[in-house]
């Protein structure tokens, strides 16, 4: 009996030590977490003068201040760290930290993101923002986690518009036969084919020279890209077709995210949303200036009635709605 009591005492002693050790480990980990510092890189492909770059730099400064220097973010515009697909692949692997990428490319990682490639999905900016900042937008951001990516918020690249060097665009027939540079995106390609154009996939870095040399007749991009990349210098005509609303997704590598303590995660979430709202407003105000500047340059700007365009691209919806999700498409179209 004495022997049994002795053994029990030893066991209890070891258990007590184990619990104390466990508590010590937790406090040590907590201290390490609070003391740890991160130096992160954030990349995107837009020009350094684009509002998204300006606001991303602001966000980096605010996060550094709020984390008391524990997180420092360096921002790299103009594809310095690679193209969007390359950067997202890096974020998935944990070799890249933060990426601000178009949904046209993020759709290759999560098919649900391809919904934004559908032409004429949104009537205006207000409808788009209501969707992106609501349950549908959050559902789409959450879907990135299965790819080793964390979607933080939707920023904005604006509505995509059509430019060309041949003629003003007033109706679908004016597009017929034009060689239009597009991204290598099947929905975009099918949409332009449905409108009678000859879509030509091409890396954006090659577009200015191709337009200058007449290899292609036109291209389509938001006004911010058309202006900050000075495409209007080699394009006589701009049609405000607003055929695609182009959100940007602020994404962080899940490997980086999982290493953050809760307080830093909360700061990132708060800043991701607040800075997105500022960037959108900056872009809205900038769009008016971009149009005025292009008119001064001599660019011919038209605002075609998009009703007949919408009719012509209905087969594109029929082709892709099943893969993307008929329910979510209907929810967006029904949003007022």
PLM regions: where:
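N-terminal secretory/targeting leader peptides
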Residues: 24-127, 136, 144-336
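Short, low-complexity disordered leader/linker segments with a strong preference
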Residues: 1-39
